Amino acid sequence: MAPNIRKSHPLLKMVNNSLIDLPTPSNISTWWNFGSLLGICLTMQILTGLLLATHYTADTTLAFSSVAHTCRDVQYGWLIRNLHANGASFFFICIYLHIGRGFYYGSYLYKETWNTGVILLLTLMATAFVGYVLPWGQMSFWGATVITNLFSAIPYIGQTLVEWAWGGFSVDNPTLTRFFALHFLLPFAIAGLTLIHLTFLHESGSNNPLGIVSNCDKIPFHPYFSLKDILGLTLLLLPLTTLALFSPNLLGDPENFTPANPLVTPPHIKPEWYFLFAYAILRSIPNKLGGVLALAASVLILFLCPLLHKSKQRTMAFRPLSQLLFWTLTANLLILTWVGSQPVEHPFIIIGQLASLTYFFTLLILFPIAGALENKLLNY
């Protein structure tokens, strides 16, 4: 009998073992769709980004007008740009839901997979930040100025580091050029890290909603989950195309329709919606270095999840106390996102400070206590 090329060819064999014959737990829910959706988001962002890069000029005098030219004069340039800008928002929606699912179902106990995932999140955040600077509008320029300036809070080397990042004494042409280079490079780094992430995942196999070993009941990925993922894809593309075609600027800042002007500061400098929770935590601390440390901690705290797991059960499916805390944390993040979009005045300052405190308190103290308490209640 002739060998099946899918199983014998050195390259196809790898694809087969990852996407076709991959043994998958039979009970994984729709929450497990977001991994493949993130892969599709990345592919789409790289393709649309590549097409945009062919028409973009990384120069302070030309960047703004080159983006306008893309939207006005290039065939479907407006569509490519709208898909790219809003695709970033959907990328973050998917990654936040993906992390939330991992947190709820205890997927962080696969430490290598979880840690590479957190590194992926950090790389994605860096990519989105440098990308937001490229259109060289007012919010692009001032966002770049404010966020890069945070590095000056680092003792002793801070100021040198900032000027090195800027390539001068302020955000100017060298900054834009290097940000474009980074924005082009980082998505490919994300693609490479994704392969590492998947390699670690396929070492252990997927987790499942019950959090139990599922070796006794696994089914092939294709056709069951490939079809399920296509359904997820259509449900992602529908709101994305709706947003890109009907209201492409809904999530953007009107300030970015004004070309960058170093002499005029916008009344409210704020990042895109997906960074607002971290921005609110940064602003809630009056000290500059303290704010920067809290900002870094708000994301780096994810690395501690495996260490803070005290429950004998893996998932939160049968842990009502932890469930309550999980949804409190979700509401807390939504409050932080809202506060981050508001001006720095009463009552938003105190709300932001309380929400920031609750965020860290819940993750670092309440979750481990709840896990230990649930063990005790179940006589473990």
Swiss-Prot record:
Residues where heme b b566 binds: H98, H197
Main subcellular location of this protein, as a coarse class: mitochondrion
Cofactor: heme b
Domain of life per record: Eukaryota
UniProt keyword terms in alphabetical order: Electron transport, Heme, Iron, Membrane, Metal-binding, Mitochondrion, Mitochondrion inner membrane, Respiratory chain, Transmembrane, Transmembrane helix, Transport, Ubiquinone
Cofactor note: Binds 2 heme b groups non-covalently.
Keyword Secreted: no
Cell compartments where the protein resides: Mitochondrion inner membrane
Transmembrane segments: 34-54, 78-99, 114-134, 179-199, 227-247, 289-309, 321-341, 348-368
Membrane-related topology note: Multi-pass membrane protein
Pfam families: Cytochrom_B_C (PF00032), Cytochrome_B (PF00033)
InterPro entries cross-referenced by the UniProt entry: Cyt_b/b6_C, Cyt_b/b6_C_sf, Cyt_b/b6_N, Cytb/b6-like_sf, Cytochrome_b, Cytochrome_b_C_euk/bac, Cytochrome_b_N_euk/bac, Di-haem_cyt_TM
Record's keyword annotation contains Transport: yes
GO CC terms, sorted: mitochondrial inner membrane; respiratory chain complex III
Gene Ontology BP terms: mitochondrial electron transport, ubiquinol to cytochrome c
Disulfide links within the chain: none
GO MF: metal ion binding; ubiquinol-cytochrome-c reductase activity
Quaternary assembly: The cytochrome bc1 complex contains 11 subunits: 3 respiratory subunits (MT-CYB, CYC1 and UQCRFS1), 2 core proteins (UQCRC1 and UQCRC2) and 6 low-molecular weight proteins (UQCRH/QCR6, UQCRB/QCR7, UQCRQ/QCR8, UQCR10/QCR9, UQCR11/QCR10 and a cleavage product of UQCRFS1). This cytochrome bc1 complex then forms a dimer.
PANTHER family, alphabetized: CYTOCHROME B
Family to which this protein belongs: Belongs to the cytochrome b family.
Function: Component of the ubiquinol-cytochrome c reductase complex (complex III or cytochrome b-c1 complex) that is part of the mitochondrial respiratory chain. The b-c1 complex mediates electron transfer from ubiquinol to cytochrome c. Contributes to the generation of a proton gradient across the mitochondrial membrane that is then used for ATP synthesis.
Protein name (record): Cytochrome b
Organism of this sequence: Ciconia ciconia
Lineage: Eukaryota, Metazoa, Chordata, Craniata, Vertebrata
